[in-house]
Amino acid sequence: MNNWQHFFNNPVDLSEHLKKPYFRFDNRDKEITAISFDEKANLIWSGDSYGCISSYDPTFQLYTRYRGHIGGNSVKDILSHRDGILSISEDSLHFANRRGVTKLNLTSIDIAAFSELNTMCYSPHSLKNNIYCGGDNTNWGIASIDLNRGCLDSLLNYSSKVKLMCSNNKVLSIGRQTGTVDLLDPTSNRTIKSFNAHSASISAMDLRDNTLVTVGKSKRFYNLYADPFVNVYDLRTMRQLPPVSFSKGTTMGSGGADFVQLHPLLPTVMIVASSSGSFDFIDLSNPTLRTQYVHPCQSIKKLCLSPNGDVLGILEADNHLDTWRRSSNNMGMFTNTPEMLAYPDYFNDITSDGPISVDDETYPLSSVGMPYYLDKLLSAWPPVVFKSEGTIPQLTGKSPLPSSGKLKSNLAVISSQNEKLSTQEFPLLRYDRTKYGMRNAIPDYVCLRDIRKQITSGLETSDIQTYTSINKYEVPPAYSRLPLTSGRFGTDNFDFTPFNNTEYSGLDPDVDNHYTNAIIQLYRFIPEMFNFVVGCLKDENFETTLLTDLGYLFDMMERSHGKICSSSNFQASLKSLTDKRQLENGEPQEHLEEYLESLCIRESIEDFNSSESIKRNMPQKFNRFLLSQLIKEEAQTVNHNITLNQCFGLETEIRTECSCDHYDTTVKLLPSLSISGINKTVIKQLNKKSNGQNILPYIEYAMKNVTQKNSICPTCGKTETITQECTVKNLPSVLSLELSLLDTEFSNIRSSKNWLTSEFYGSIIKNKAVLRSTASELKGTSHIFKYELNGYVAKITDNNNETRLVTYVKKYNPKENCFKWLMFNDYLVVEITEEEALKMTYPWKTPEIIIYCDAEELRKPFFSVDTYSINYDILFRDYFANGIRDTARREYKLLTHDEAPKSGTLVAIDAEFVSLQSELCEIDHQGIRSIIRPKRTALARISIIRGEEGELYGVPFVDDYVVNTNHIEDYLTRYSGILPGDLDPEKSTKRLVRRNVVYRKVWLLMQLGCVFVGHGLNNDFKHININVPRNQIRDTAIYFLQGKRYLSLRYLAYVLLGMNIQEGNHDSIEDAHTALILYKKYLHLKEKAIFEKVLNSVYEEGRAHNFKVPETSKG
């Protein structure tokens, strides 16, 4: 840090606006009280004693100024936020965007705890959605403010005066007026550690990661003097480290430290300054290594460091702002990734030499001035005509088009007639206005100045996570169709972070049959289901593909802690399973929906022949199919479990009687309960018994119902009236309910506020299930079961008649002994209130699948796979899909138990893929090309080699080719080395394994804590469909990255290692071994401290040769 220069020789007066003539009779102090750099824009902010907040660009030109606090209260503290700027005064909190427009303003009238405030900081774990405010008022403690809701979230009991506050991702550090520092855990509202930092008071404090630094004052001879040292604390061990001396108090005379701040990018570097002008940059790892500077001024009032660590702002006692800058930062940038600033539109007077034609589209009509007028214009319509300006009539219900399928409007008839004209050779494609715009429409006028100032920041996080709306007919943003931009490799370039502020992972919709994501999320939060499915991973269940892949998916979602996951492997198993059953039945279908229709209709009593009914009931059919298949595969596991059978199984007795006195009784074990329409007379009687309209009568009726239909009697062979009575004989711990009601029935449901009850009680009385809202109504029965709502899947229908599925789940928090509700809309996850979750009055919301769990089962903990004894045998043996072929050449050596991997073991990996389907693009009416369906790939080969030093260093222990019976569009032989027929079990001479076998090997290595070395591992792991923790990845593509240009493995091997690889087709063993050597080279360059120099030369040479390896002359 020895290249700092006093860059700005003419300091700017930040209090110039306080020297206006109208302030001359005001005797209050006219000072700047706070300064702070913006983390998202090249701005520095200041607050004054009159409550005004001002911002300046790097040239110190005024950008914006606004009054944030009324009443003449001074600005106490300023915080930078991703959406704007936060500031506090003694009794108010103000939140505005960078243009000065108020987003939130809270005063002591709104929150009584706002009194004598001094400081604020962000709350741990909140991702800057909550802040803590504290001050001298000890009656209220510390107030937690929710910025999303704009209200008081909670109050922390704290009985001391607060002067300073800062936080990391775990604790809240509080500096008292007396000089003591307290570490507070916001979760438990408990002080976990206190440090007696300074004897009199604390002056400055900063916290970053696990390092806390403080400076303060001590009392000597009835006066306060700054301490000539900096206190340093390690929050991992909760101990104080040796204090670091300040040069002002040692080598440069008497004095002490008044300011301290940790470097934002270098975690071990801090800046320490004195109010007299001297300041040091000190390395905590080596305190003797420091650089000393002196700022020429009378005294320093405030000091702050820019987010990129290149600019030091100093506020002098006369309210002038001066800066020091590093010599490398001549542009004066405050942040490395600044957002574009918005500027006002300026009116340009357009002069014309002659008259302008009315048809001239290049001339804006808004530039024609309006004459002054005294009379009322004809265009000013009276308020009698329109109730409000610029509004459209509100919707009074759902789409007017009938959805029952029985009545067709004229539009539907015309549409069906047009569809008959469509052929396979000449398909009929409807014109889509949303994609191609209005027909024969003149393009809108676009000003070039607006294009220059346009900000492509996308959706606001606070907007997209809003799950309520004032108008109940309007679909809130959280339920809307989410934006998704696909690139060449799917959704790699899409930023999912603004859509999830929780620790629970969403699912990527970029998969086939993505509507199944909602049902997967529903069952992931059932404790008994999760524990069993994940527990099956401890054994090698290679024959139960769907159960195993669901277990891997649940485990990945649990480990990812909010990172988005993909269900691509689960979808592949689902497709292979349906293909297998279709071949067995001799009825091939093209899509999963068609297969579910053919599978589920046979077991259903009702007739779902209309195409609309198939669409309406597809989630219910998939739910029934999923549970049935999981229960079937459960019996095929190593331990032959019956957990799911006991958990979901409904013992149903079906009695069939014919008018010819013939009857038959069968007993079936059904995994789910279908709830269909109920007779109005029956529902009224059941509602009277349950004391109100709710879901209980529907469940009761579904557990014991009678249906009649005319059919041929199997005994007499005549057409008779057959009566079928279905009775449920037990109450399992989990009730999976499938709702198949008509729109008219849902309309009646929406009129009831508490239709979806949160809990109920049930018992079996006289071989019949009886359900009541309270336990007192079931007195006299021996066994009473309490059920609570675990979650449900709802269908959202927007104004465009587009539908999507969302999931509501209830998660138990054992630490706080309470539940919280979450809503999943693919990759959007938001925590909601219970009232909102149970609300069924919205016309756009329709429940599809509902889960009720036993109250005790719902409170069981979720066990990860780490709690089980895992079988690792597959790492030490082969498991081929097509048997061992003598002609196959073995290029690897299996691991032995003596070299069993452990945590930190280095392995190098490379994967190859084939293309199943090419990408699909479209060009809209503006000529913009976008990828609407990325290419589909499949894993073809994985090679893993040893990375630890020893005799077998660099020798592969896994080299598996993956079976693929699907249609392969492109083998990508040039890049993958896979030839046609290599993956076909009937033709291949390779050692083929199934996908779940090779996946288990990679999963076990991750489970053991192995460190993976490779080139472009993010892309490999995405296609393998596994989320590996960052601390277990050593990606050479990122290590040798400068800017945004990724270097190929072949080029890096040629430049750094002198190796010429990939001369023919790619070989995964060669690529993995090269990446391992390249990683060793990286460590060597880092150890010699010449890595940056070598990397610069690599890029300089690469630009000269276009980053390509020179072709070797042959012959």
Swiss-Prot record:
WD repeats lie at residues 27-66, 112-153, 155-194, 197-236, 295-334. A divalent metal cation binds at residues 910, 912, 1020, 1071. One of its GO terms (molecular function) is metal ion binding. Its EC number is 3.1.13.4. Positively regulated by the regulatory subunit PAN3. Negatively regulated by PAB1-binding protein PBP1. Inhibited under stress conditions. Inhibition of deadenylation under stress increases mRNA stability, which may be a mechanism to retain the majority of the cytoplasmic pool of mRNAs for later reuse and recovery from stress. Zn(2+) binds at residues 660, 662, 713, 716. It is an enzyme of class 3 (hydrolase). Pfam families: PAN2_N, RNase_T, UCH_1. It catalyses: Exonucleolytic cleavage of poly(A) to 5'-AMP. Residues 337-473 are annotated as: Linker. Its main location: cytoplasm. It is found in: Cytoplasm. Signal peptide: none annotated. Its cofactor is a divalent metal cation. Residues 907-1079 form the Exonuclease domain. One of its GO terms (biological process) is mRNA processing. Changing residue 912 to A: Abolishes nuclease activity. The keyword Protease does not apply. One of its GO terms (cellular component) is cytoplasm. Belongs to the peptidase C19 family. PAN2 subfamily. Catalytic subunit of the poly(A)-nuclease (PAN) deadenylation complex, one of two cytoplasmic mRNA deadenylases involved in mRNA turnover. PAN specifically shortens poly(A) tails of RNA and the activity is stimulated by poly(A)-binding protein PAB1. PAN deadenylation is followed by rapid degradation of the shortened mRNA tails by the CCR4-NOT complex. Deadenylated mRNAs are then degraded by two alternative mechanisms, namely exosome-mediated 3'-5' exonucleolytic degradation, or deadenylation-dependent mRNA decaping by DCP1-DCP2 and subsequent 5'-3' exonucleolytic degradation by XRN1. Present with 1510 molecules/cell in log phase SD medium. Contains a pseudo-UCH domain. This ubiquitin C-terminal hydrolase (UCH)-like or ubiquitin specific protease (USP)-like domain is predicted to be catalytically inactive because it lacks the active site catalytic triad characteristic of thiol proteases, with residues at the equivalent structural positions that are incompatible with catalysis, and it cannot bind ubiquitin. It functions as a structural scaffold for intra- and intermolecular interactions in the complex. The linker, or PAN3 interaction domain (PID), between the WD40 repeats and the pseudo-UCH domain mediates interaction with PAN3. Forms a heterotrimer with an asymmetric homodimer of the regulatory subunit PAN3 to form the poly(A)-nuclease (PAN) deadenylation complex. This is PAN2-PAN3 deadenylation complex catalytic subunit PAN2. The gene is PAN2.
